[in-house]
Regions:
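N-terminal helix-turn-helix
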Residues: 2-81
Length: 83
């Protein structure tokens, strides 16, 4: 798995996995399910569940076979910037 850091004994693995997916989608400007599953060395079914959750929460959008970051991140960025 790519880029884990910190004390993993005190973290939630599913949250780390979702953020690794988001980082990879950002870095590649869109990725397919297969590409993401291969990159994180996860089963496609596991990767799909993460992506479906992120899609339902409007953090990613799917266009055809590709997943992209959604505009919801702009709201988070605006909030962080105005702090």
């Amino acid at each position: 798995m790519a880029g884990s850091s910190g004390n993993t004994n005190e973290t939630v693995q599913a949250t780390e996995t979702s953020f690794e997916l988001l980082d990879r989608i950002r870095d590649t400007n869109g990725s397919t399910l297969s590409e993401l599953a291969d990159y994180l060395d996860l089963a496609k079914s596991t990767t799909h569940r993460h992506l479906l959750t992120l899609e339902n929460l409007e953090y990613v959008v799917r266009e055809g076979n590709e997943y992209y970051l959604a505009l919801r991140f702009l709201k988070l960025g605006e909030s962080a910037q105005s702090r």
